[in-house]
Amino acid sequence: MNSWTGLSEQAAIKSRQEHGANFLPEKKATPFWLLFLQQFKSLVVILLLLASLLSFVVAIVSGLRSNWNFNHDLIIEWVQPFIILLTVFANSLIGSIQEFKAQKSASALKSLTKSFTRVFRNGELISINVSEVVVGDIIFVDAGDIIPADGKLLQVNNLRCLESFLTGESTPVDKTIDSNEKATILEQTNLVFSGAQVVYGSGVFQVEAVGIKTQVGKIAKTVDDSVTKLSPLQQKLEKIGKWFSWFGLGLFAVVFLVQTALLGFDNFTNNWSIALIGAIALVVAIIPEGLVTFINVIFALSVQKLTKQKAIIKYLSVIETLGSVQIICTDKTGTLTQNQMKVVDHFCFNSTTQTDLARALCLCNNASISKDANKTGDPTEIALLEWKDRSQLDLKTYYRVYEKAFDSIRKLMTVVVQKDNRFIVIVKGAPDVLLPLCNNVQNEVKNIENLLDQSAGQGLRTLAVALKVLYKFDQNDQKQIDELENNLEFLGFVSLQDPPRKESKEAILACKKANITPIMITGDHLKTATVIAKELGILTLDNQAVLGSELDEKKILDYRVFARVTPQQKLAIVSAWKEAGFTVSVTGDGVNDAPALIKSDVGCCMGITGVDIAKDASDLIISDDNFATIVNGIEEGRKTFLTCKRVLLNLFLTSIAGTVVVLLGLFILGQVFKTNLLQQGHDFQVFSPTQLLIINLFVHGFPAVALAVQPVKEKLMVGSFSTKNLFYNRQGFDLIWQSLFLSFLTLLFYSLGIIYAINNRDLQTSGDLINRAGSTCGFFILGASAALNSLNLMVDKPLLMTNPWFFKLVWIGSLASILVFLLIIFINPLGLVFNVLQDLTNHPVLISYSFGGVILYMGMNEVVKLIRLGYGNI
C-alpha cells in the first residue's frame, strides 16, 4: 500500500479544536419521570388503579356512615387503597428502573462496539476510533468499512459505496477521483459520505467534514440502535397479561352483581360495599402483577452476565432465541482457530527467491505495521508482512497505481505497482484458483498440487502469488483491466499455520452433547478444513465434507464441512437448515457474511475481526472471536428460559389458587358461615386485596431474583432444548393439581380457623375477628407455600434427598419471603394494615393450622416426587 503523510498529532488536535469532534448528537434519552408515567399505560396497572379508586369510594362511604369514627374497620378500609397504590407504584418503579437501565445498556453497547478506522498520521497507517477523526485526516477504507466522515477521494481501486440512507438508491455507487461540477453534492462520485457502506474495492480520501457538519449530520438522521425487540416469550406474556386482565374485569362485574344479589337487595346501601370489596379481591387474585417485571429483570441479568463473558447482546429477545439454537454455522479462521497466523513453510518455483516471494506478498497487501509495532489489517496479511525483514525488500521504490480488491468469489487480490518505467501486476490468492491463470507451470502443476495437498493435509492454509510485467498500463482501458489476471508467472506459495483454540474442541463436544450440530463453513482448501474439523470433532466421516462448487442444494443437510464457499452458497446453507425447521446461528465477520447473518435466527459477528457492516447485521457480537463464547451464550439462554418458566409457574400457582379460594370463599364458605360472619355487618371474604397483593408481588420478588442468579444443577447442555412450549413434561398438569391442592388446603384451614374462632370466647363476639382468624391461616398457607414452591421447581427428586447448599440462594429467597409473612402476622401494626389477627401468639392452634397447611402442601409434593422416582414418569 502506498504511504501518505497525513496529519501530525499536533495538527489533528488543532483541527479538532477548530472543526469539532466526529460524532452526532445521540437521540435524547427518555427521562426517568416519563418512563415512570409510561408504565401506567398497561392494562394491568389501569385495573389496579381502578381497584384502588373503588376502594377509596368504599372507604369514604364507610367514613360518612360512621361519622368518621376511625375504628379498626375504617382504618383497614382506608389503608387498603393506599396499599394497592403502593403496589402499583412499586411495580411501575421497578419497570421504569429496568427501562432506564436498558437505555444505559444501549448507550454502553455503543461504547463496547466502538468502530475504528484506518488513518495516515505522521506517515504511518494506524487504527483510531472513528470519533477521533478530524478534518484534514487521510483515511483508507476497503470492503466492509463504514465511511467515518465526509471527504474527497484521492485514490480509488474499484471503490463502490452504498449510500441508500442518503439518496434512497439501493444500488452501490461507483466512486472516482473525477469531479462533476454540474452534479449535486450527493451525486458527486468523487465524494464519500459519513455512514456509507463500502461494499467493494478500496480507496483513500481526505476528510472535509465531521460530526454534525457532515451530510448525515445536517439532516439530523441519527441511527438509534436501541430498538426494542420482544422475544416470543415476552410476546406470549403480554398476551397472557391482557387475557388475565380482561378475564379479571369480566369476573369482577359478574361477582359484584351475583354477590350483591346473594347478600340481598333489601339492604343494598350496606351490602354493595361488601360485594365491591370481594370483587376487588378477585381482580387482585387473578392478575399476576409481577408477570412482565420479573421476566424483564431475569433477561437483563442474563445480558449483564453474557457481556462479562464477552458476548454482547443487542436485544433482550436474543437471549431466548440463543437457548433454542440447534445448528451453528461457524467460520473456521479466528473462530475455531486462534487467528494467530504465522508463515511456517514456503515453496519457491523455479528461480524465484525467498526475497522475490516475500516482496510480492508484501506489495500485494493492505495491512501495516507501524514503527512502534502497532498492527493494522487482516491477520493473514499481517503474517505475510512479519515473515521476512521488510527493510531488505526495497518496498518504498514501488508505487501502487491500481488495486482490484480481494473478494470471496474470485478468491484473488490484484495490485499494479510501478517501478521506474515498469508496471508489475501482482496477484495473490487461493492456489487452486491462481495456478490455472499462470503460463509457466504447465508441466509442474501436478507436483505443485501434491505439495499443496501435503500442506493442506497438515491443516495449513496456503496462499499463492504470481506476477507479470507490463510496460504500459492504463486503468481506464477496460480490456487491459480484464486481462490483468491472465498469463501470469507463478512465483510460489506460503503455508500458514493457525492452530485450533484449545477451548474449541471442548465447545464442539458440548454442542454435540446438547444435540446442537456444529457446521464449518470456510473459504479454505477442503483438505485444510477437513483436518481441522476432524481434530475438533466436527467431522467424523470424509463424505460429510464438500466443496462449494460441488454442492448439491438438495443434500445440504448431509454435510458438516463446506469449503471454498461463496456468500451465496453460505446463504443457501443457512436457508436450507431454516427451511427444515431448525433454529440456526451463524458466525461471520466480512461484508459478504451480512446476508447470512440477517437470514439466521441468531447472527453472531466477531468483535475483533468483524467489519462494521457485519456488526450492523448481527444480533450478537462476540468480542473475543471465540466459538466457545457462543456455546456459553446458548447455555445461558437455556438457563434464562428455564428460570423464567419457574418464576411463571410460581406466579400462576398463586393466581390460580388465589382465584379459586376467593371465588369459593365468596359463594360457598360465605354462605356456610354467613350467620357468624355477618354479625355487625362484616364481610366474609377469605382474603383482603392487600393480602393478595403481598402474595402476588412482594412474596414472589425474593425467590424470582434468587432463581435468576442461582446456578442451575440441571445438565442444560445435555440433550435437546426447546423454548417453543412454555410448559411441557407434566408441568402444566403439575400446575393444575398443585393449584387446586393449595386452594383446598387454604380453604380447609380457613374454615378450621373460623370454626376455632366461633368456639373461642375471645373471638366469637365479632364477625370480623372470626373472619380474620380464618384469613390469617389461609394467608400464611398460600403465601409461604408459594415461596417454598420455588424450591420444589428446582429439582425433580424430593427436597429431602438433595443438598440444600446446592440451591442456597433460592433457600435464602424463599425464607426471606416467609420472614415477610411472619413479620406481618406477628407484628401488630403490620397485622392491622394487612387485616390479620393481632394477638396470634395467644392462639397457638391457629399458628399450628398455618404451619400445618404449609407442611401438608410441601409434603404432598415430596410424596408425588418420591412416587415418580420409584415408578417412573407418571
Curated annotation (Swiss-Prot):
Residues 63-79, 258-275, 665-687, 750-770, 827-844 are extracellular. GO terms for biological process: monoatomic ion transmembrane transport. The chain crosses the membrane at residues 42-62, 80-100, 238-257, 276-293, 645-664, 688-708, 727-749, 771-790, 804-826, 845-865. Disulfide bonds: none annotated. Residues 1-41, 101-237, 294-644, 709-726, 791-803, 866-874 are cytoplasmic. It is an enzyme of class 7 (translocase). It comes from the Bacteria. GO terms for cellular component: membrane; plasma membrane. It catalyses: ATP + H2O = ADP + phosphate + H(+). Its EC number is 7.2.2.-. Mg(2+) binds at D589, D593. It is found in: Cell membrane. Its main location: membrane. Keywords: ATP-binding, Cell membrane, Magnesium, Membrane, Metal-binding, Nucleotide-binding, Phosphoprotein, Translocase, Transmembrane, Transmembrane helix. SMART domains: Cation_ATPase_N. GO terms for molecular function: ATP binding; ATP hydrolysis activity; metal ion binding; P-type ion transporter activity. Could mediate calcium influx. Belongs to the cation transport ATPase (P-type) (TC 3.A.3) family. Type II subfamily. This is Probable cation-transporting P-type ATPase. It comes from Mycoplasma genitalium (strain ATCC 33530 / DSM 19775 / NCTC 10195 / G37) (Mycoplasmoides genitalium).
